[in-house]
Swiss-Prot record:
EC number: 4.1.1.23
The name this protein goes by in its record: Orotidine 5'-phosphate decarboxylase
Family recorded in the similarity comment: Belongs to the OMP decarboxylase family. Type 1 subfamily.
Keyword match Cell membrane: no
Keywords for this protein: Decarboxylase, Lyase, Pyrimidine biosynthesis
């Protein structure tokens, strides 16, 4: 059983060496790390294995989105890496979701484990309502679209969803059953400084009901990542203790 701690450090780097250097510095304090599309495309399964050798929990965030057969076969290969979490796009549709859930459920049963958590991506945190309409042609408001997709994720059996901090309360108040909510778009201040549109501080996101916080650049691009981690821990420690 993994001890719960809500911070996941996103290793969003274009090279394996830099990612592992950061992980080595932080692993005494943080055990959860995210490997996204950029890093995985460079380092492949080796980066996941290297991180796991450090004793970490690895979130493989590839946001799978393809025909059901392709997604299931890809998931099957990712499961061999024993990830902590895996993502796919809810927009991939009901059949893709159900087939993915079936495979992951069989894996969990066979291996007597509750991991990986299978998570569905709702609406990317770089999107706003104008982007939603112009890029996807969807007339729902952004919160309505997030809720619609989260409900589909729940109906098809996913463990949780990826959603911005702005939609946490909406999901907590409207989903029929509790689901994991994993939250990107976490920044140490409310000031917008990059491509993330819907952001929030770590404490605010946890107070609203997020289970896990994905934090990348504020930690990994800091001159002193350890200091940033300690600052975040001091802000949220009482909330974490109440959940243990």
């Amino acid at each position: 059983m993994r001890k719960y701690y809500p911070i996941i450090v996103a290793l969003d780097f274009p090279e394996e060496k830099r990612a592992l250097e950061i992980a080595e510095k932080l692993v005494p304090y943080i055990k959860n790390f995210k490997v996204g599309l950029e890093l995985f495309s460079v380092a492949g399964p080796h980066i996941v294995k290297a991180l796991k050798e450090m004793g970490t929990n690895v979130f493989i965030d590839l946001k799978l989105f393809d025909i059901p057969n392709t997604v299931v076969r890809t998931l099957d290969r990712l499961l061999a890496l024993e990830p902590f979490m895996v993502t796919l796009h809810i927009l991939g549709g009901e059949e893709m979701l159900r087939e993915s859930v079936k495979l992951v459920s069989q894996y969990k049963e066979s291996n007597k484990t509750e991991y990986p958590y299978l998570l569905g991506v709702t609406v990317l945190t770089s999107f706003n309502e104008e982007t939603l309409r112009r890029s996807w042609g969807i007339s729902r408001s952004l919160p309505e679209q997030v809720l619609f997709l989260a409900q589909l994720a729940q109906e098809t059996g996913l463990d949780g969803v990826i959603a911005s901090p702005w939609e946490i309360e909406l999901l907590r108040n409207n989903l029929k059953r509790p689901m994991l909510i994993v939250t990107p778009g976490i920044r140490l201040t409310k000031e917008k400084t990059d491509d993330q549109q819907r952001i929030m501080t770590p404490r605010e996101a946890l107070e609203r009901g997020s289970d896990y916080l994905v934090i990348g650049r504020p930690i990994t691009q800091s001159p002193d990542p350890y200091e940033v981690i300690q600052n975040i821990r001091s802000q949220i420690e009482d909330i974490v203790e109440s959940r243990l």
